[in-house]
Amino acid sequence: MPVRRQARPDAGATSLTWPSGGRHLWPSGGGSGAQAHARGHLVYAARGVLVLHTESGTSIVPANRVAWTPAGSTHRHRAHGETDMRIVFLSPSLARLLPGRPAVFRVSGLAREVLLALTGPRGGGHDDEDGAGAGVDGGDGGGAVPGYGRAASGRLLRVLVEELREADEQPLHLPHPRDDRLRAIEQILTRTPDDTTTLAGLGRQVGASARTLSRLLRDELGMTFYEWRTLVRVHHALVLLAEGHDATYTAHACGWANPSGFIAAFTDLVGTTPGRYRAGG
């Protein structure tokens, strides 16, 4: 049977864990402290929205995405809305097939079913060459559950990784800039996503010209200011929608003058409309 444990009080999660992965049920606002694992892992929110913070940036993981965190990367989680988080650890041989940095992928129907199978009643019972060998979020790593045999578990994990290799990386990982001036602007955008100050105006606050900031954004993040601010706003929008707010409220709270502009930007990044997203589609 899986190890049932109540997570640390600050985390607020009820967890089922085994050597190759686990399942965490978090109330809205729950989360984990900073941690790192010896093996890379995938996290998927079967329900709710998960925010994954790493040293390199922040990833939003809604129900149609999966986030990859390489071995040794310090990270922490936070749930928005009641969140059912699934986690699968990968062996070094499989981890080498994925990026060497945090990434977010769109989840195909097959990948979703494999993730649910590996972390459901039958999954997670074996630690073979293509499985994992570390506990989940500070768990003791014991208590394997009966389920798939070693060979079947290995095949499922290989299918999952191949599905992710075929999937496009999604722009839901928000990298942290290195430059102090960009970091100051990042704090402003994150704290007040409805702020409509231009890049030139923000530059005056941090002591840099719009031209300098544009160059830094291109060099450090590979995006324009418009793309960066839109991504920050969509991150915030996913959280608000998970907390039960409608599209109109969310649009204005995130800085869009009208819902249609918000819907277009949201759909472009997330792959579905805010309404369908709230409805679970």
For each predicted feature, which ranges?
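Terminal helix-turn-helix DNA-binding modules in bacterial transcription factors
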Residues: T196-A200, A208, D219-I263, A279-G281
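Short acidic-glycine-tyrosine-enriched beta hairpin
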Residues: S56-A71
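Short, Lys/Arg-enriched, Trp-marked, Pro/Gly-tolerant hinge/linker segments that flank
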Residues: G124-V206, D219-L231
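Generic protein-terminus/edge-of-domain signal
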Residues: M1-L50, S59
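Ligand-binding loop in jelly-roll beta-barrel domains
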Residues: G72-P102
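Short hydrophobic/aromatic patch on the recognition helix
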Residues: N64, L213, L217, G261-F262, ...
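Aromatic/histidine-rich interaction motifs
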Residues: P99-A117
